Amino acid sequence: MELEKQKYRIYLDDVRTPVDKDWVVVRSYDEFVQKINEIGLENIDLISLDHDLGDTAMREWHYGVVKNYTINYDNITEKTGMDCTKWLVNQWLDGKPVVDVVVHSANAVGSGNMLGYLNNYRHLNRMEQNCVRVKIEHTV
């Protein structure tokens, strides 16, 4: 009888920490990539993404928001949740297992960009478009 391996949940956020201690918390793009490579996508049950992973992303969102605003990624010096999203989709394109992803970012524009990217991949591959924006209880 083979024991079922533990499935992990990855929580990407540079500031917040989820109340539920079952999440594996990563704070940056580099940590995100390292942890997923270490654990393996086949052992991950769920990924929750933040968009703004540093000061310049936060400033771009807070000070640039106007009607019909689009994020100018040229103004952001650190990698964002969008970079993590693109990396993740590239893993799927390379044949790695597709896992469920949600977005918990307060940045509505960044969230929309990530959700669109993820759900477009799923749509093009005839999968359920189940990537949604959620609120996860956190300590900060």
Regions flagged by a language model, labelled:
Residues 1-140:
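Catalytic phosphate/metal-binding cores of nucleic-acid and nucleotide-processing enzymes, i.e., regions
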